[in-house]
Amino acid sequence: MFFSLAFALFGFQGQITPKLPVRAQAVSGFQKPQRSKQNPNSVWFLPRVSNRSANTKGKVFVIMYHHIREGANPMFRSASKFRQDLENLYNAGFRPVTVTEYVENRMILGPGASPVVITFDDAHPNQFQLRKDGSIDPHTAVGIWSEFSKTHPDFPVKGTWYMLPVMWGQKALREKKVKMILEMGSELGNHTYNHKFLSKQNDEVVKSEIAKMNDLLVKYGIPANMPLCPPYGEYPKNKSLVKSFSWKGKTYNHSSACLAWDAPALSPEDSKFNKYKFERLHGNSYSMGIDYWLARLKAGKVKPYVSP
């Protein structure tokens, strides 16, 4: 559902409903989104990103990364190639949103922008590390992305990080790192406790795997109704468990669940969209990875979601 606002070019301050996507156009060039001091709920003014026609039924790129490191492995993406991915996405008109913003159809985008949902699985240390001086390791995913955002402020570190108990290592710094990444605009999600194939487990094991990780993340201030990512994209036999269940006298709910396949996802406005079963594509150069899909996009063989 889209919410159209008529407003004067300068100074309009209208109340918005948080769950409705809101778009406004700046006068020219990039203008960092700001809220009025007098009215903190005012409309955000965002620049036009491209002259493409609106297409709110188009495909959404939900990209899945694991390791930021060198190596011939589909789960690896080198630091230089990840940096190039960000550049390619930016130049193609993509701007980042979280999984929750996507599935709830409340993506705040400038006109002509396409949403990209950047996700990271497994919480590997090469995704986010702090150095002894407290600075972010520039060779990690967060380091590369945050550096990119300095010259591209409309492409902030806003993604979804599906966590395992390792939580990027550096246990003594865990709380600090969670706070930092949330302040950047990202969110954390549940990738289960032991990364098991849920399709091979009975209901009790599935509940335990999901609940234990949920409980751990809640201790760090993550909302209990968080996104879920079943390991390997394998759903439990009882698929209702990815939505909600009761375990040891407590009820658990998740706001979404994703697959781990090789194609762009449906728009949240598509009648077939299911927020508990949306697709992702690999952040790699292998068959059906991000390089493949960006090439198809350039060739006009895939029609992306474009904000009005």
Please place each PLM-identified region on the residue numbering.
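A short alpha/beta connector and helix-capping loop motif
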Residues: 129-150, 158-161
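Sec-dependent N-terminal signal peptides
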Residues: 1-16
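Generic enzyme active-site microenvironment
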Residues: 119, 162, 189
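C-terminal active-site subregion of NodB/CE4 polysaccharide deacetylases
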Residues: 19-119, 125-132, 136, 200-308
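Substrate-binding clefts and substrate-entry loops adjacent to catalytic sites
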Residues: 189-200
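Short amphipathic alpha-helical segments and helix-helix/interface helices
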Residues: 83-86, 142-150, 175-182, 242-248, ...
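Short, conserved secondary-structure transition motifs
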Residues: 165-169, 234-236
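Acidic (Asp/Glu)-rich catalytic clusters
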Residues: 55, 109-110, 146-156, 170-190, ...
